Amino acid sequence: MDPVNFIKTYAPRGSIIFINYTMSLTSHLNPSIEKHVGIYYGTLLSEHLVVESTYRKGVRIVPLDSFFEGYLSAKVYMLENIQVMKIAADTSLTLLGIPYGFGHDRMYCFKLVADCYKNAGIDTSSKRILGKDIFLSQNFTDDNRWIKIYDSNNLTFWQIDYLKG
């Protein structure tokens, strides 16, 4: 199953979606294993939406299909507490329009996710890089609170059994 259909069918609001692209301006400078992340907002007026922060546009909301344009690989993670995930998804909307960057009043994709989940009561550890606390994909994927429910490079569907309960 492709990631878009998987998310539309199984992923709860607030799931975090990691993707790697064929072409990225920042991928060579990015020490993160997964190069980009967004928060699955859910549906609004029958449109599946993702909140992300990009180099050119800052924090924005995009259709799920657009989020995946040009992707190479994808992974989807969730928490056991769906209510916390909903709070994080709702928080992501309050950050729309913040410019991209690493300063105090700026937001890059991994910080977006960390800040949304911090507001929902989930603190994420950071890495100290060049004197700054930076969030990377590893800060989420290495945290055992996060459950991987989809990996486009390993399409075993034990994950679906977990989601069905």
UniProtKB/Swiss-Prot annotation:
The keyword Transmembrane helix does not apply. Keywords: Host cytoplasm, Late protein, Virion. GO terms for cellular component: host cell cytoplasm; virion component. Belongs to the orthopoxvirus OPG091 family. Displays sequence similarity with a group of bacterial permuted NlpC/P60 proteins. Thus, the ancestor of the OPG091 gene might have been acquired from a bacterial source at the onset of poxvirus evolution. Contributes to vaccinia virus virulence in mice but not to replication in cell culture. This is Protein OPG091. It comes from Vaccinia virus (strain Western Reserve). The gene is OPG091.
